[in-house]
């Protein structure tokens, strides 16, 4: 039976690699298939409730993408080193949750190049490919290094971003497809320019800790978009709790409507009413 309406706490969009990416919206206990709603009128209404995605308590404000303030201050997944992995302090025995750190940070990470709104460098756990690329709305992506820990991947990223961006311009992302980039050539250029720095990191952590991926292939990703927005305007459910319009596309964590665009991940843990007409 086709989805008509529902209400619940939301999580980030789930995107499965396909031609194009196949999206769904976690809404309470259900997952709303989104691709089939392209061209339909959808309505999202913030119901004035936010429940922490970790402990479930009600909170007036969302911290660290869906947490309450107490959880934000105590969870390792909300620490500053998640945003700045080179600042990892696990080896100082000050990790908020050492067991969590063992599982999520002391594991193989991939340093990659992507083309979203232009060339950028990024990192992710090896198990999060291609999810990370889809979440960022990348049209092309290429793994370039396999690194032993999150901290080490952050140090490599810090080295490479001296010559390439590490951020995505969301407006450019939603205005259209980026011009294709020769990611293999960019990989060779960037790694060549960072050779001395990479060798220093290998000397510090061991040769096997930072390994190039010369045989990796470029992944092309296509998104379900009927029409891009020439001048994307971002919806703010905090100020205007109702957003309604024709769904024209889905890219990264954004829904593109003819009235505005909305970053769904920004509203993680918000209770929304979602309907289709």
Where in the sequence are the language-model features?
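Non-catalytic accessory segments flanking enzymatic or RNA/DNA-binding domains
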Residues: 1-277
